[in-house]
Amino acid sequence: MGLERVVVIGLGVSGRSIAHFLAQKGVCVLGVDKSLHALQNCPYIQEKYLENEEFPSQVDYVVRSPGVSKEHPWVQAAIASHIPVMADIQLAFQTEKFTERESLAITGTTGKTTTILFLEYLFKRSGIPAFAMGNVGIPILDGMQNPGVRIVEISSFQLADQEKSYPVLSGGMILNISDNHLDYHGNFSEYFQAKQNLALCMRNPDDLWVGDERFYGHLYLEEVQKYMRLLDKESALKPLYLHDKYNYCCAYLLAKTEFPISETSFIEAVATFNKPPHRMEYLGQKQGIHYINDSKATTVSATETALLGVGNQAIVILGGRNKGCTFSSLLPALRKAAKSVVAMGECAQEIARDLEEFPVTVVKNLSEALLCAEEQAVPGDVIVLSPACASFDQFRSYEERGAMFKQLVGMEEVLL
C-alpha cells in the first residue's frame, strides 16, 4: 500500500479487524482507544495510545472504527493536518479482491440485516455460494476472504468518509431513509448524503436500486410490489409482517440482477427462512397476554413499522437513548395500534413530553416497564418492546436488551 504508519481509532470488533488487516500488510499500526484493556488485548498494534493523549507525528492515514464519531478529537486532529480519514469499507474497497467477483451491498435506515441474511439464504438455497459480512456481524476485512458472492451490509457511519469513488460493487440497494443517527451525523442532510455515497462504490451507478426518489438510482417500488403480489397469492405461506415481505422482495430483486433465480425458489426460501431474533419476535402468551420482542427497533420509523402488525390493543414499551429524533411522529400509529405506552430509560421524560396527548407511564428500567405493562394488560392485549431508541443507556446492545426482555417475560412460567 506504500503507507507505513496508520492510526486505528477504536479497538472493538471492527477495530481489531482493521488492525489485523493492516498488520498483515506490514503496516506499522498505531492503536487508540479510551480503554487501556482494549489496547493491551490487541496484539496487532505497535504503538498504543489512550484517546486523551496527543495525536502522534508522521501518520500517513487514519482508519476509524464505524462507531467512532467524526467529531472524535483524533479524527479532527487528522483532518486539521490534512491526513486522510477512512472507515473499514474504504480500506476493503481499495483491495484488488473486490473486483474479482460479484459484490453486493445494502444500506438503509431499517431492514438491512433481515434483507442481507435473507439474500444470503436465498443464494445458498439456490446453489450459489454467498457470504454476508460488514455491519451484519462479520467485519468486511475478515469476511471478504470467503468464497462466493459478497453481500455487504453498510451503515451510514461507514459511508460518511466516502469521498472518493471505489467502483467495486456489481449491485447495490438503498432500502429506505428516515430520521436516524442524527446524534452522530448532526442533521438529516448529512445522514442522507452518507447513504447516497453508496453510489460512489458502484461499478455502474445505474445498477443502484433505491427506495426513495430523492436518491440517485433506479426506483425499485414497482418491481418490489410485483413480487409482493406474488407472495400474497401463496396461501400456503406462513403469515408474514408487511415489512418482512417488503424486505424479502427487495432481496429477490437484487438477487435477480445477478443470477436467474426462479420465483419458485424465491417462494420456497421465504417459506423456510428463519428471521434473526429481536425483530418482531413473537415470544408466546401467558394468561391470554401476548408478548413481542422488537428490541432491534432503535428508530422511530422502525417502531412505526412494528405498530402496523400488532392489532389495536398494544401496550408499547419505548425508551433508551435517543438518537436525535422526536417521538411525536409516533402518535398516528399509536392511536391506531396501542392503548398505552410505558416509557423507560434515559429519555423517558422526553417521550412523555412528546406524547403528552397519549397515555404514558414513566419508569426507570426494562424490569419496571414490563411489570407496569403487565399491570395494565388484560387477556387479548399485546405487550411489545419496540423502543424507538438505542440501548446504550442501560445495555451494551439491542441484543442484550432483547435477551433481558425475553428472560423477564419467561421468568414466572413457560410461555405457551
Swiss-Prot record:
Disulphide bridges, residue numbers: none
PANTHER family cross-referenced by the UniProt entry: UDP-N-ACETYLMURAMOYLALANINE--D-GLUTAMATE LIGASE
Major site of localization recorded for this protein: cytoplasm
Catalytic activity line of the entry: UDP-N-acetyl-alpha-D-muramoyl-L-alanine + D-glutamate + ATP = UDP-N-acetyl-alpha-D-muramoyl-L-alanyl-D-glutamate + ADP + phosphate + H(+)
Transmembrane segments: none
Record bears the keyword ATP-binding: yes
Family: Belongs to the MurCDEF family.
Keyword Signal part of the UniProt annotation: no
Annotated EC: 6.3.2.9
Gene name linked to the record: murD
Descriptive protein name: UDP-N-acetylmuramoylalanine--D-glutamate ligase
Source organism (scientific name): Chlamydia trachomatis serovar D (strain ATCC VR-885 / DSM 19411 / UW-3/Cx)
